[in-house]
Every structure is written in structure tokens, then in C-alpha cells.
Amino acid sequence: MEEHHSMTVAPKNMAILVGGGPAPGINSVISAATIRGIIDGVDVLGIKDGFKWIMRGDISHIKELNIDNVSRIHFRGGSYIGIARENPTKDKKYLENVVTSLLRLNVDKLITIGGDDTAFSAMKVENLAAGRIRVVHVPKTIDNDLDLPHGICTFGFQTARHVGVNIVKNLMVDAQTTSRWYFVVSMGRKAGHLALGIGKSAGSTLTIIPEEFPEETIKLKKLVDILVGAIIKRLSSERPDGVAILAEGLVERLDPKDLEFLLNIERDAHDNIRLAEVNFGEILKFHVQDELKKFGLKATIVAKNIGYELRCSDPIPFDMEYTRDLGYCAAQFLIDGGNGAMISIQEGRFVPMYFNDIIDPLTKRTKVRMVDTQSEYYQISRRYMLRLTKEDFDDPHELAKYAATAGISLDAFRERFYYIAESDVWQMPDLNPNKFPRKINPVVNQEISDEENTVKPVSEKLPHETGKGKKTK
């Protein structure tokens, strides 16, 4: 009988790393993925501080993950294995070091957790590994700006919104109590999802996001006039208080002529402006108060940034459950031989979104999801904001109130502020029921026959059974 000799091959490991900024739910992904891998006999390694060390060829910053040390971390914010914004795509040598380091650690399965920059890095690592390492990405950001299908949020967003709403709720009470305005600048990068989510949920006086401006660049003066107009409108109702939520992404869209204050602003490893370092709220406060003085008006304004206090909050149950699904599916996808995809849960089912399908053909990077200002979600939020609209300028009585508050004529008020309403993308939500014709459900149009104990469609009944037609003697 022929003998078969087999070589003993060391079992391959699965590695997990976290890039970008913190978001509630990271630990739940780590926990779920680790437990799923270990149950299948796979050893799991936590790569500390994202790509920071392995892109330099240093494999000493590793934490062995097991059921004992991850089974309860899902309750907590932060990252059990640290986090970093280090960018391995800046230099091919860094990418080569990442792949080599993982191979030295006997890793053939990699789970990355992060936002659009980390997703791009994961895609580059997968390409360079050429099948030696299978890679899957779990989308994470409080900004909610990854290109997932409509209605599906990135993990961490719901918790960040929840915490942000509680902060704004307290500011709204403080504003009313002390007769002042708060200008709250919310994190969110280029998109306005977080600012709008907080503002709409809390019922803030108004929320301004970059997506509402159709023009490529936004004039600082226009932002100032929107805020001044809202304050005047509020004052006309004898309310000297309010809370304005401002998306930090507005900064990147400002006219270059208004960007002198950004010349020395620090950028991160992915060349993004550190928007949280821009004192945007204070800049707007200064200009708004200066404009109000021209009308003989005065407002106490306090500028506040929110973002850092949201990122490491303990996740709410929604994000704990959601990230458990994401972590499980990420590990299972790799165990089953999957590769090169971003994890998503759509209509309760796992759907891999392959890297090649989520790349923007123009930027060659992962696509960024912006707020759809044509959606009823946005249009309804605008309906509850207090800011100057075209309707205001069509109502002579309201217009007279605003002009009187500003101490100028109706014509002067119109000339000064109408342009901000004229160029506005907002429109009344169209919920006319005629847009939604009723569908006939055949089951509803049925009755049960007592004689036969069977369902008989109305259309099949005889005239005397329906009460229609003449009875014959």
C-alpha cells in the first residue's frame, strides 16, 4: 500500500486593526469577530494602533485576543487595541511593510475597522497581498459618510447622534434661560449627516450643512447672513435665544478668499484639514455680531464644538447589536474564503460590497455619501427650522415684522436678505396622496362563504349574492 506523507503547516491567524478616529461600537466588532474566529479554531491577533507599527516593519505591538479578554468589552467606548490615523498608502515601502509584517505574523485574514481612508488603505493592502492575505473592511465613522445604501448608517453614528442630542438639549435650555444663542459646530468631515441628525432630533433653531449650497464654493458672507436673518426672525417673535448647528464640512467649501485663517491649519496623515482645529464658531460669532450692530441689534453668542466627546461614548444598544452583526459577518466572510469587500447588513442580511464597486472613478478613492437635500428626510427637517424662506418674503405682514426688528424699510430688508432665500434648495415636502395610488390587495376584496367555508372573490359572486341586479319570481 502506498504511503502518503503530509507536511505540517502552521495554522493561519486572523488579525484585526482599527484606523481613523474613534467611534462607539469598535469594541463590539472586535469582540464579535474574535469570538467567531476562535469558535472556528482560528487564532486572533489584535494589531495595536492601526497601521502605525506594522507599516514600519515592527511586529512587537500585538495583543492576542481570546474569549476571556473580549467577552465584555462591547459595553465600552474606545478601542481595546488602540487606534491611529497612520497612512500606509503614502509610500509603497509602507504598504510592503504592512504585507510583510502580517505574513511574518502568519496572518492570512485581516479585518480592518475604519472610515473611508482606512477602507482605501485596506483595498491597497489587499491588492499588494495578491491573494496571500484576504482582507475585509468594517465601515466605521460617526460621520455616516461611507457609501452604504440609502437608509443604512455607519456604526457609531447613532450613538454619536444620541449623545449629541443630549448635549444640544441642555444648550437649548441654557439658551432660553440666559437669552443667548449657541453656534454649535458638529463633526462630520465633508458631509452634514451628523449635524443634521443632531439638529433635527433635538429640534434646534436651525442647522446648516454644506450640501444645501448648490454652488461649488460658499461665501462666508452668505453663512453670516443666514444666521443674521434667523436671529432677526427669532427676535421678531420676542425670542432672543436659539441654537444653530453648523456642520464642520462648511469650512472646506468656503471661498478661497475667505480661507486666510486656514493657511496654517494642521492636516492629518491623509492630508485632510483637521477641521476640529478651526475655530469656525468663533469666526462666525465675530462676523454675525458685527452685522447685527449695523441694525442696532445685539446678541450674546457662545461658540461650541462637539465631536470629541461623542467618539468614545459607550455605544447605545442599537450600535452594540449592529456591530455584533458586522463583526460576526466579517469573520465569517474571511473564514468562508471571502476577500476584498466592505461589510454591510441590508434588509437584515449580510451583503458584501466589493472594493472595486465602491471606488469613485474620478478620485480613485472610496466614495463619500452626502446628505440628499431632495429627500423628504431633509425637506421635513427644513420645515421645522427657523430661518428666512421665500414664503417670508411673499408675506407682507411677516416681512414688515422682520424689517421693523432690523430697523430698516421693507425694500431694504428684501434687498439685503432675499438672495439667501432665492438660492435655497429647500422646498415644501410633497406628500400629496395622489402621488401614492393605492394598490388593490385581492385578499382584502374577499368574503368567506358560510355555506362552503371557502373564500369566494366578490367578482365571482352572482348578482343576487352581492345585492345587485333584479330578483326574479
Stretches found by the model and what they are:
Residues 23-33, 54-55, 92-96, 113-123, ...:
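Short glycine/serine/threonine-rich phosphate/pyrophosphate-binding segments
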Residues 13-16, 73-85, 140-152, 177-179, ...:
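Gly-rich Lys/Arg/Thr-decorated short loops/hinges at beta-loop-alpha junctions or inter-strand turns
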Residues 19-21, 42, 47-52, 85-86, ...:
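Short, ordered loop/turn segments at secondary-structure junctions
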Residues 1-7, 54-110, 118, 142, ...:
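Glycine-rich oxoanion-binding loops at beta->alpha junctions
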Residues 44, 101, 109-114, 120-124, ...:
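Accessory alpha-helical/coil subdomains and C-terminal extensions
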Residues 4-58:
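N-terminal phosphate-binding or glycine-rich loops at protein starts, especially the Walker A/P-loop
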Residues 259-473:
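C-terminal non-catalytic interaction/assembly regions of soluble proteins
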